[in-house]
Amino acid sequence: MNIDAIAVDIDGTITDNKRRLCYSAMEAIRKAEDAGVPTIIVTGNIVTYAYATLVLLGASGGVVGENGGVIFKENYNNNQIKTVVDRTYVNAADKHLKERLGSKFDKNISNDNMYRLTESVFYKTITKKELEEGLKGFEYLDKIELYDSGFALHVTDKRVNKGSSLKYLCNENGIDMENVMAMGDSENDEAFLKEAGMKVAVGNAEDFLKKNSDYVCKNNYGDGVKEAIEKFVL
């Protein structure tokens, strides 16, 4: 299989358990870029954070941010951030959660929520089960998704995910998904891994992701990313 593009998550994949960018991943991604294979950042993070990571890596494939809610790539869409969905259902979910959880809502919602265009994020000082309980009785429960990224909990619009937006960005740029190698570590990475021709789980990935991957790295975090790029791309 020819790999024409790499799609990779940030937290827990190209960063370690302290959220530090792994030099090994950076080095491998730059070598792939030099060989003509671009890297796309696919993350639950805000698009500005993701784009900064893209620049630091020396990558050129663009960004899928907020679990698929936003897309950005230089020289695409007039260099404007493309918002795939609005916050209608997410805002309604926030209102419902605030009414149900009270002060617990304010204490646990992420400080970067003001920068998010399509989703809401909560620190893991609150559990997924507590948020699920808080969402009981929500009128539009079938319109939203609750993800655990390993570092935070995300309330997103069900119409999009990392996979659908990665596929859209690749199609817009003439890249066949069968020739994409996707790498991740957690629950919210499943959606974009299953769209790719080559599915890779880094060594520290959750078990269910490993079971549904074509290749499981022997190494963790960025060392796993380097391992996969050297094996399948370079």
Swiss-Prot record:
It catalyses: 2-phosphoglycolate + H2O = glycolate + phosphate. The keyword Protease does not apply. The active site is at D9 (nucleophile). Pfam families: Hydrolase_3 (PF08282). Keywords: Carbohydrate metabolism, Hydrolase, Magnesium, Metal-binding. Mg(2+) binds at D9, D11, D185, D189. SUPFAM superfamilies: HAD-like (SSF56784). Transmembrane segments: none annotated. One of its GO terms (molecular function) is phosphoglycolate phosphatase activity. Substrate binds at K162. Its cofactor is Mg(2+). GO terms for cellular component: cytosol. Catalyzes the dephosphorylation of 2-phosphoglycolate. NCBIfam families: HAD-SF-IIB, Pglycolate_arch, PRK01158.1, SPP-subfamily. This is Phosphoglycolate phosphatase. It comes from Methanobrevibacter smithii (strain ATCC 35061 / DSM 861 / OCM 144 / PS).
